[in-house]
Amino acid sequence: MPKMKSHRGACKRFKATASGKIKRERMNGSHNLEKKNRKRTRRLHQSTMLDNATKEKQIKRMILA
């Protein structure tokens, strides 16, 4: 049986922290930033943790395979 391969798209979008949580980037922070106010663009450049437990289990399976 061959080794399981990790999902390369998920590996580029999500990172696992040392405690096992999943870190992700926020959407809408890459272009059309002149329309968005400064407070919003600062918030969009911060990374955040994934809070959906069912998605977290799926993503862990994809990136830690």
Curated annotation (Swiss-Prot):
Plastid recorded as keyword: no
Database matches in Pfam families: Ribosomal_L35p
Biological processes per GO annotation: translation
Annotated transmembrane regions: none
Residue segments, region Disordered: 28-53
Disulphide-bridged cysteine pairs: none
Keywords, ordered alphabetically: Ribonucleoprotein, Ribosomal protein
NCBIfam families assigned to the protein according to its UniProt record, in alphabetical order: rpmI_bact (TIGR00001)
Protein name: Large ribosomal subunit protein bL35
